[in-house]
C-alpha cells in the first residue's frame, strides 16, 4: 500500500487504507492514522521504528508513474505526430513541424526514463492568446499533476522544487517578456543535466 514515487521523491499510499484521502502523497494525517492503527492492532508504539519500516517498505515498492504509464502504451498504427500541431493549433503540417514535435516528444520520453540525459531543446509555440498552446502542453502531459506552467523566473530559489514531480513545463510568461539576457539564462537552464533540489 505504501510506495516510493521516484518522480515526486515522496512516499505515496497507492491502495485504499480504510479512511478517506485527498491525494496519494503520504502526509502527517496519514501517519497519525497509521500510528493509531498499529498501536491498537499490534501494540506498536515506537514512532521512529514505524517511520523507518514505512521508509523500507516504500523503498522496496518504488515506482515512476510516467514510466509506468508509457510502458502500458501500445501503438495502434495510426500516425499522430505528423498532424498533431495542425489538428490542435492550426500549424502547417510540414516536415519542420513534424520533426520539431517528434524531437520534443522523444526528449520528454528520454527524460522520463533517463533523468538528466542531454536534451537542450525547447518547443516554442507562437500564437495569440486563447490559441490553445497551454492546453496543448497540458494535454501532452496526460495528467494535470504532470504539467506545470508555474515557472516564472529561473533565478527563483524554488525553481527546481517547482520542476519536481512534473513532466511537461510551460514557460509562456517567461518567454513573453524575454530579452537577450534572459534567453541566455534559459539556454543555460536547459543545458543543465543535474538539478540540485
Residue ranges and their predicted role:
Residues 158, 169, 192-196:
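Residue-level signal for pocket-adjacent positions within structured domains
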Residues 54-168:
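P-loop NTPase catalytic core of nucleic-acid-dependent motor ATPases
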Residues 4-8, 145-148, 194-197:
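Short secondary-structure junctions
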